[in-house]
Amino acid sequence: MKFERGLEKLNIEFLKDKPLKDFTTFKIGGKARYIVFPKNIDELIEIIKLVKESGINWRIVGNCSNVLVSDKGFDGAIITTTKMDFFKTEENLIEAECGCMISQVARKACENGLKGLEFAVGIPGTVGGAVYMNAGAYDSEIKDVFECAEVLDEDLNIFKLGKSDMRFSYRHSRLKEEKLILLKATFRLQYAREEDVPPIEKANEYNQRRREKQPLQYPSAGSIFKRPPGNFAGKLIEDAGLKGYRVGNACISGKHAGFIVNLGDALAEDVRKLIYHTQKSVYEKFGVLLEPEIEFIGEFETPLFEMSTK
């Protein structure tokens, strides 16, 4: 096939017909026709040119820590950025490629006495994913430290966006609105003062809290739902009596109801059914429609709940 030959000619690493469950933190998902691993921005651009010329479906992902992949897999190319992982620190600025693990960038910042990214040390996603969804925890968000980014548009033009250009809001950025691909981001941090809790201590404290409150022993995609205004998804789910509720081997965690965990070989459709049931139950009990925070890849039989389907 033209796409495959193009990758081989450019010496770009790829896998063929491999299950995506091996690449997601949920450990769920069928096969992708291709999984492609660009090592730098030039390779990423060449891959996108090839998928456009070949007319095949494509999707860019990072660490797949916030996604549910269909049991049917993905009939096209999954482009994963995890090998685009260079970052550098200049005084209180950190510039990181999209595939860097945000946890590693954050830990390095903390070790260097820089504060602002302590909340991200336990987040399992990439810089690209963190900026895309304005990731956050413990009353902090990526937008708080975001300085600027280089992005790629549909016509393969590279340009810079500043903080005000990104239209950040809760778990949202301009990257979700437009077909823009983040290539690298720069974060502006602050030097910790003598009277401050050392950043690495604060980061370690946050991680300890995560271990105590989150079901980290099971595969998951993190928080399944966005926080509804004035409330918490996990509390509403727990108050609806759904802790421990399961469909197949997908289960609402008994430790933290905001998580759905994979107890072993769970199917994506099990998770979708569980999401639907959770949305429906919470809406009928409290009148609140929970909106998924995770991304969906591929085709699903089970719909998401809508108020009109009540």
UniProtKB/Swiss-Prot annotation:
One Pfam family this sequence matches: FAD_binding_4
Record's subcellular location: Cytoplasm
FAD-binding PCMH-type domain span: 27-192
Keyword Phosphoprotein: no
Enzyme Commission (EC) number: 1.3.1.98
GO CC annotations on file: cytosol
Pathway(s) annotated for this protein in UniProt: Cell wall biogenesis; peptidoglycan biosynthesis
Named cofactor requirement(s): FAD
Keywords for the protein's UniProt record, in alphabetical order: Cell cycle, Cell division, Cell shape, Cell wall biogenesis/degradation, Cytoplasm, FAD, Flavoprotein, NADP, Oxidoreductase, Peptidoglycan synthesis
InterPro entries: FAD-bd_PCMH, FAD-bd_PCMH-like_sf, FAD-bd_PCMH_sub1, FAD-bd_PCMH_sub2, MurB, MurB_C, MurB_C_sf, Oxid_FAD_bind_N
GO MF annotations in UniProt: FAD binding; UDP-N-acetylmuramate dehydrogenase activity
List of catalytic residues: R171, S223, E293
GO biological process, one term: regulation of cell shape
EC category: oxidoreductase
Family annotation (PROSITE patterns): FAD_PCMH (PS51387)
Superkingdom of the organism of origin: Bacteria
Annotated PANTHER family: UDP-N-ACETYLENOLPYRUVOYLGLUCOSAMINE REDUCTASE
Family according to the record: Belongs to the MurB family.
UniProt function note: Cell wall formation.
Protein's UniProt name: UDP-N-acetylenolpyruvoylglucosamine reductase
Species whose genome carries this gene: Caldicellulosiruptor saccharolyticus (strain ATCC 43494 / DSM 8903 / Tp8T 6331)
